[in-house]
């Protein structure tokens, strides 16, 4: 079980089971949303339990980004498919994950 949270702790989450290796995305949307590239992993939606209120921004016709409404931490990227992407930096350490 891996856990993570936003900066202020208002949103926490737990991930049961395997997570994908961390990937770096340099697309325009990721850079504009964070001011840098994004390092993210993902897991099946049904393996992620979120506690707290996440604000979702529809960043494209096919994807939305989840962040904490209090501190603004980028937490999730929700696009097509069975997995929800999780920003690697919000996971509690150590993760045991490696970058692909």
Question: Model features per residue range: what roles?
Answer:
Residues 1-100:
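A short Gly-Trp-Pro
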């Amino acid at each position: 079980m891996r856990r993570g949270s936003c900066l202020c702790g208002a949103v926490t989450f737990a991930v049961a089971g395997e997570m994908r290796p961390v990937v770096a995305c340099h697309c325009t949307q990721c850079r504009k949303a964070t001011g840098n590239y994004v390092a993210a992993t993902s897991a099946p939606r049904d393996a992620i339990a979120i506690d707290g209120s996440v604000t979702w921004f529809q960043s494209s016709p096919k994807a939305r980004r989840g962040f904490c409404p209090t501190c603004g931490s980028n937490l999730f990227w929700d696009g097509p498919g069975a997995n929800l992407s999780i920003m690697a930096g919000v996971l509690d350490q150590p993760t045991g994950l490696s970058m692909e």
